[in-house]
C-alpha cells in the first residue's frame, strides 16, 4: 500500500457525522440533569419533580442505546478493509466493551461504599459494554437486525413481568428480576430488552448511512461552534 492510499484511507475513516455526536451529547446532558434531580432528592435537598424525572427516564436511555447501535454500524461501514484489519476492528470493539464494563464495575464499587442499600449491580455502563461485545456477530445483518431487535425487546418486556425470587447475577443480566427490583438498586438496565434497542440502532444506522455518506439531507452544522464542541465530546465519549 503506497503512502497516498494510506492517507486517503485515514481521511476516509476519520469523517464523522456530527448529528450523531449532537444527539449523543444531548443524551449526556439530559442524563446529568436527571442525576442532579435524583441526587437532590436522595440527599433531601429538593423532592424530584416526578413528571420531569419520569420523562427523562423514558427518553434518555432509548437515546443512548440507539446511538450506540447507530455508531457501531456507521463505524463498521467505514471499514472497507481487508479481513486482517476487519479482525482488528472487531477486536477493538471487544476491548472497548470491556473498558466500559470496567467503568461500570468502578461505579458498582462506588455505589457499594456510598449507597450500600441500593448499589448498582448491572447498570447502564455494564449493559452498554456487554451490548457492544455481543453486537459483533450481528453487524453483518445490518438493517435486518430489526427482526432480532423486535424479538429481544418483546422477550425483555415479557421477562420484566416474571418475578424471580433470589435471582442470580445471570438472571439480572438477562432481565429476570425480583418484583421490587428498584428497592435493591438505583440503576438497572438488563440485556433484554436493551440489547434489542442497540440492534434497532444498528438497523436504523444502516438505513440512514452508506459508508461515509448520509442518505438524507442535512444543513452544514459544522460551521457552528456548539456543533463542533459536540463533535469533540462525541469523539471522546463512550462511542
Task: Label every model-predicted segment.
Residues 1-239:
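Alpha-helical transmembrane segments and their immediate juxtamembrane cytosolic regions
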